[in-house]
């Protein structure tokens, strides 16, 4: 039976046979770690996904994917800030570690 209410928790994202799958248990050294709101056994609401190499997405989730306002930070300090849709940049602005604009996505297309 699926969890239908939203609550705080931790999940791990792993690639299994070419598909990305959410698990309740994982290894922070090799798997992506999600901390935040969970419903229906996947991220839904506000949360943070941390990659083993230090990359991080902080923001809104829907049905296990980045959806809504968020910030994706790459390990070199580059950030993409704005709206994400279905796990990808939708309407975002990219900034280097010094805060200079380095790019934009508008309706999912890099400008």
Question: What is each stretch, according to the model?
Answer:
Residues 1-111:
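Glycine/tyrosine- and acidic-biased, solvent-exposed loop/turn segments at the edges of beta-strands
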């Amino acid at each position: 039976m699926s969890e239908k209410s939203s609550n705080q928790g931790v999940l791990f994202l792993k690639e299994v046979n070419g598909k990305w799958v959410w698990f309740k248990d994982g290894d922070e050294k090799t798997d992506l770690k999600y901390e935040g709101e969970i419903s229906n056994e996947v991220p839904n609401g506000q949360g943070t996904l941390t990659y083993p190499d230090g990359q991080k997405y902080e923001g809104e989730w829907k049905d296990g994917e980045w959806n809504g306002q968020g910030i994706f930070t790459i390990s070199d300090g580059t950030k993409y800030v704005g709206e994400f849709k279905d796990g990808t940049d939708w309407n975002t602005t990219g900034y280097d570690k010094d805060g200079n604009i380095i790019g934009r996505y508008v309706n999912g297309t890099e400008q």
